């Protein structure tokens, strides 16, 4: 089964990749880059915002699935756009609550203030929320298409993007072929921009521009795919089987 395969191969592989790149980063740049704690705590808080944004969409969908309400939901006059709007609003509320809690804990336990990022913090957060939406809608479409066997993707899919999001290390640590993939990931540009602000104070205009453009294109594409998935599942009667 997919959960067993992921337990045996997926999570150990991701752990190896993430910690391997972090180790390379620390080994190569320890003498050049001060304040690793500043980078890591800031990155952790921002990453959790992306994760909660994605969870707000996928978990909302799974709750309808577990309640066996999926068929009734999409057989009603409810439009796919209204469903997405509601789940996106839920994700924003989750992000708001979790960010306040994490920022407060970081300040209380480590005297770390996320506001040191300055005026760029809000654009960073907004872009990460949109990236979370993209992953969430994509994951929801997969679960709708392939059924409950794919439920595990609600928690695991987002972490597939973590190595190429360059959360805890700069993009240049990655192999060249993986850097090319990371460049297509909006989150990677946000975390690169965060490190630029904390290390030099320079405005991350280029990083934000890339993130906004990529988020816009990917969001339009993934919403279009969601619409097609809903239509396909209705035509093939998959909503009945998914909800059972």
Question: Can you say where each PLM-predicted feature lies in the sequence?
Answer:
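Hydrophobic transmembrane alpha-helices and immediately adjacent juxtamembrane helices
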Residues: 1-244
């Amino acid at each position: 089964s997919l959960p067993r395969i992921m337990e045996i191969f997926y999570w150990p592989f991701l752990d190896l990749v993430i910690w391997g790149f972090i180790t390379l980063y620390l080994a190569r740049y320890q003498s050049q880059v001060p304040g690793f704690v500043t980078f890591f705590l800031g990155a952790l808080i921002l990453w959790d915002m992306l994760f909660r944004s994605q969870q707000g969409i996928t978990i909302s969908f799974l709750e309808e699935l577990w309640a066996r309400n999926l068929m009734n939901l999409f057989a009603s006059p409810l439009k796919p756009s209204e469903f997405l709007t509601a789940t996106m609003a839920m994700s924003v509320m989750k992000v708001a609550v979790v960010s306040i809690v994490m920022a407060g804990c970081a300040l209380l336990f480590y005297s770390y203030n996320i506001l040191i990022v300055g005026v760029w913090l809000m654009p960073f957060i907004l872009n990460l929320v949109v990236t979370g939406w993209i992953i969430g809608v994509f994951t929801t479409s997969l679960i709708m298409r392939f059924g409950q066997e794919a439920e595990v993707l609600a928690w695991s899919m987002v972490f597939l993007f973590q190595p190429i999001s360059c959360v805890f290390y700069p993009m240049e640590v990655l192999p060249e072929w993986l850097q090319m993939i990371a460049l297509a990931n909006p989150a990677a540009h946000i975390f690169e921009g965060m490190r630029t602000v904390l290390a030099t104070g320079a405005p991350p205009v280029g990083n934000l521009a890339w993130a906004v453009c990529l988020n816009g294109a990917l969001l339009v594409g993934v919403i279009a795919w969601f619409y097609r998935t809903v239509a396909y599942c209705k035509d093939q009667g998959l909503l009945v089987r998914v909800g059972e």
